[in-house]
Amino acid sequence: MNQFTLPVWVVAAAKSATNILIGNKFRDKERIDLPNKEESISVPISSSALLDNGKRSLAVSHCQSGLPLDITRGVEIWAYIQLSKGSSQSKGKVQNGFPDWLDFHAGCGVGKFQSSGQPCISQFARDLLCINLYPLVPKGNSIKVEIILPEGKDRASKTSNEAFGVVDGLSLIGTQAEVQISASPDQLKNCKEILYHKCSEAKFDGCLTFVIGENGMDLAMKYGLPANQIIKTGNWLGPLLVAAAENGVKKLLLFGYHGKLIKLSGGVFHTHHHLADGRIEILTSLAFREGISFDLIELISKSTSVENALLTLEVSNPDAVSLIWSRMAKEIEIKSRSYVNRYLSSSMEIGSVLFDRKRQMRWAGLEGLKQINSLGLILKR
């Protein structure tokens, strides 16, 4: 089973289409070189062909993450390629973050930031494209890459993309080639091994940050949180909190999107939605405890999702939203400390920071605020 993240399949299709365009024979597998690694991986390609009398090419791949419940599983990827004369193929950057020889277009089904219209694509995905396409681009040419995900918009409607300000399709935000199975025992084991390794390093200062999923990782890096302190946790937050305390962590920061962390404020410490949800119920409880009006509490309780409830509240009563999320951040810290002390006596300080649908840090508990302020970061008001 080829368990690779969506960016890998995108790059494989782009590389296959480029090979066809420059006269190479079609191969049903493409070798993909990885950033900062000597080895490469073999990625299956469904088809590839020349278009417009050889002026353009198209290749198709199908994302296979290996996860039955993964939203990207089976997604069809179309990569259109076209070469143009006149580029120096220098390594200079342009505004969208790509070198000047690579003209990247997010086609139908690829997520874009609502605020700017720019494609939602991670640095890993950008680097992967550059590393694998640059050797194939003839000297003096530039390459236009257009990626289309025919089912992308429909698939994205089942995700929390809009909560991050991403619209029109699926994000290309993987930070590594291999899929991490966020709800499996193996993923918990891997996270514990990473945690143990970080805590065993001579330079370890007792501080760690748990980020939740790819969006959390992407934002943590953009905000400049210390990379050597970051662990992407997936869904096994409870056992990892305890493991952090056992391994001598003094200050722990929980950094992520409210859609995951809200569960901690309700005492749910395995956050995969197929195992435990209850987010609307937790949100309703938080609103009640903050003294929000009954009409708004009823609105929350009848919402189809946390995101829909928040969007409605932001329009009708933005002050209520701020009260609810501030309460949530505080409850996350309280419930997390209580969870850890259920298993061992620990003085580990646990802070929480939540970001909003515009990808801004907006809410924090008291400890979370102290920790980000010590890094020179402030909350968006």
UniProtKB/Swiss-Prot annotation:
GO terms for molecular function: cobalt-precorrin-5B C1-methyltransferase activity. Its EC number is 2.1.1.195. Pfam families: CbiD. Keywords: Cobalamin biosynthesis, Methyltransferase, S-adenosyl-L-methionine, Transferase. It catalyses: Co-precorrin-5B + S-adenosyl-L-methionine = Co-precorrin-6A + S-adenosyl-L-homocysteine. Disulfide bonds: none annotated. The keyword Transferase applies. Pathway: Cofactor biosynthesis; adenosylcobalamin biosynthesis; cob(II)yrinate a,c-diamide from sirohydrochlorin (anaerobic route): step 6/10. The keyword Ribonucleoprotein does not apply. It is an enzyme of class 2 (transferase). This is Cobalt-precorrin-5B C(1)-methyltransferase. It comes from Prochlorococcus marinus (strain NATL1A). The lineage of its organism: Bacteria, Bacillati, Cyanobacteriota, Cyanophyceae, Synechococcales.
